[in-house]
Amino acid sequence: MNDKFTTASFLESKKQGRKITMLTAYDYPTAKILDEAGVDSILVGDSLGMVVLGYEDTTRVTMDDMVHHTKAVVRGVKRAMVVADMPFLSYHTGKNDSVRNAGRLVSEGGCKAVKLEGGEDIIENVKAIISAGIPVVGHLGYTPQSINVFGGHKAQGKTIDTAKKIYRDALLLQKAGVFAVVLECVPYKLAAFISKRLDIPTIGIGSGPDCDGQVLVIHDLTGMFKDFTPKHVKKYAEIGETVSTAVKSYIDEVKNGVFPTEKNSFKVDDWIIDELDKVRFDI
């Protein structure tokens, strides 16, 4: 458990049939908890746009946002491999921009790899980033940055044409040199088919049990939000309810004079207060 998880660890896990665990984190304390709990990899996802910054989708997340949050996560990690998302339009305008932006996430942010959404349409930029010495994770199926193209959060690969495209893109990404690929909201039989035919590991989210690993958004897994739970999520806690209950108790105790008590306060000698009572300031 003390050995650092690396790109080689991803590939070795695939060969050995060991499932890979990945979760998102966007700040130092969460990253520290996940790392100490033993998760293999931490994704600084552009999902922070929704679960941290309050946007409707991921398309408004900037490079500066990603660098800022990646820095915080990296400070909390000793073992897990940190992967950072490249945000919308940061790798679509050419090889130079793609390499420059990926380089910022590594050199400024401190992550060990970057993740990009898309297949054949971005393959040359993927190759350029890898050629620059930056490891890349692919992302196929439902790609959140394309939400306006898809018309919402929808499973992908349910027709023969879309299934062929996802499979072909996975093969192209593997040939380009990515060391893993995320499959999001892909029908589980298609995800299993692709996983068996790739030499690199697949990381599933809403894509069934036969992927080589799994990733979830930490806010979904811990039940931080009550209003919406995606179909592919299993809640392992109800942190939102716990925090809400704690805050209500705090409000009640403050208003009723229950908190704080002397136990929560610092003491000073009585004579100091007596002396202060004699002081008169010329103000």
From Swiss-Prot:
Obligatory cofactor(s): Mg(2+)
Transmembrane segments: none
EC code(s) of this entry: 2.1.2.11
UniProt pathway annotation: Cofactor biosynthesis; (R)-pantothenate biosynthesis; (R)-pantoate from 3-methyl-2-oxobutanoate: step 1/2
Predominant cellular place of this UniProt entry's protein: cytoplasm
Keywords, sorted A to Z: Cytoplasm, Magnesium, Metal-binding, Pantothenate biosynthesis, Transferase
The protein's enzyme class: transferase
Binding site for 3-methyl-2-oxobutanoate: D46, S47, D85, K115
One of the protein's GO biological processes: pantothenate biosynthetic process
Protein name: 3-methyl-2-oxobutanoate hydroxymethyltransferase
Organism in which the protein naturally occurs: Acetivibrio thermocellus (strain ATCC 27405 / DSM 1237 / JCM 9322 / NBRC 103400 / NCIMB 10682 / NRRL B-4536 / VPI 7372) (Clostridium thermocellum)
Lineage: Bacteria, Bacillati, Bacillota, Clostridia, Eubacteriales
Encoding gene (name): panB
